[in-house]
Amino acid sequence: MLIGIDARAASHPQYGGFKTYTEGLIQGLAALDGPHGVRLFVDRPYQPAFPLPAHFKTVIVQGGRGMSAVGWREQVTLPRRSRQEGLDVMHFPCNSGPVWPPPSAVLTIHDLIPVLQRPRPPATLATREWRQFFIASYSTMTM
């Protein structure tokens, strides 16, 4: 099985929950002795603090320049590259992934407790209309 991981959080110098989770995931998979290949998709050179086995490959996928670079990478460049690599499954570990993901994808969602416990303010008319449009658009999509 060929596994892809959106590992850009691990390649960033800033510490935090996404980086810790992604590095832990990579380290855990690296410790397994199995026949699986792993592709780590990063947006800059990545040198982990632990050795990567031979069946791991780091792939730099950049999104471009400017404010839209992260969105373009996530929505267009990364799904395209993951299909080119012939992955069996792609894991997006940081709360977001492409609208049209690869055929087999896993998305990890973190920190839902505050969302579930916090009372939501009433939606404005514009918000309700946008939700209805968005849901109607998605319900008519064919994949």
Indicate residue ranges for each PLM-predicted region.
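Carbohydrate transferase catalytic cores enriched for Leloir-type hexosyltransferases
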Residues: M1-M143
